[in-house]
């Protein structure tokens, strides 16, 4: 396991992005917690979020797809 996937900054806040949202390159998509450190993961491209491929709170691995983004 590389880390834990979180869709929002806390349990009481809205997700950073939802399906159908427009995103810009560098925009925060989620947080990955690894070794008690919270790391924001940004989008590589401008586009539209088509799928969220990991469940909130799930353990994720290196190289595992987390989002499907249709590039603009």
Predicted regions and their residues:
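Structured functional modules or segments
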Residues: 1-72
